[in-house]
């Protein structure tokens, strides 16, 4: 055969390590490189690709061979062609990457023949392969069966019964979950605080309003209301009225949302009502005022610990306003607690919002009877303690706004500090 009978080499895809050469004739006619093509061509092909795909075009059949070019031991021939399997082909019936039980136990390399590996055949031992696929399928089936097993919802008093109207109590196996409900393993237990009745009634895949959603107390305060919507760690229920299983979500904990802003609003409301307007209405007592000031300052200190909310300007402004409410009540009380000269004091004086603070019950301070001077000393020390705590709180807020370069908030804090200095003098 002459080189003119050989078509130009056509490269296979870049992912393969082969080149293809089409020629006319029968593949058995070429047993060496001299019968195929010149040595220079073979060297060029061998330098580019490791394998050569030889396609024999005949009148009867289309045969394809994969050959490996190797150096020939014959001195007269540079290369020889050896028939080989395609590099991307896998031996049919071979259990690749699966060793027999005996080779696994001895930790030796297994050839993996289906009828028996060479090691077991040589030693005349039974060769068995582990059925990994079957075991995985079996485990998957067991998981599916476990997921559809019986689940019970129980509270602290006992198990939570599930009844279908008109049929009495049913087991989990009798309930058809395929159409409406998807059993969830995480719904094994529920707290009694989440349920308003002792049992859940299923009537045509619907839940009555007396059980779900949960009943909410009518006089619930702002803090509980907001934390119930955002920030609560209670689990959410799936929708029993959904028509398909895709819309029924598993019970999962809601993503936590910080509720410090709601707590700050509640603290602001409490300070406005009990520290400002109660004094104007002459309904505040001195001990209640001191306790309210202490609680308000403690709430603000806890709110400053939230690393997320202190980055919000509105949150910091709200805390500054709360400090202003506390400072105002301290200023009013401090004016009343100062010693007065009965001669120089005017006979008529406009009533201050905190004048009712001096209506003190001796038993509220001590069981022993105290005169007016002792009462002023005790109350003065308590108010001085409130001023000290308030000064520390304002200093912490000042560092916060200075670090973030909030100029307006800085001026507000400095105004509060100047008012605190006036109380000390």
Swiss-Prot record:
One Pfam family matching this protein: AflR
Stretches with biased composition (Polar residues): 133-157
Entry-linked PROSITE patterns: ZN2_CY6_FUNGAL_1, ZN2_CY6_FUNGAL_2
Gene Ontology BP term (one): aflatoxin biosynthetic process
Region (Disordered): 132-159
Record keyword Zinc present: yes
Keyword vocabulary terms for this entry: DNA-binding, Metal-binding, Nucleus, Transcription, Transcription regulation, Zinc
KW Phosphoprotein (keyword) present: no
Entry superkingdom: Eukaryota
Protein name per UniProt: Aspyridones cluster regulator
Lineage: Eukaryota, Fungi, Dikarya, Ascomycota, Pezizomycotina
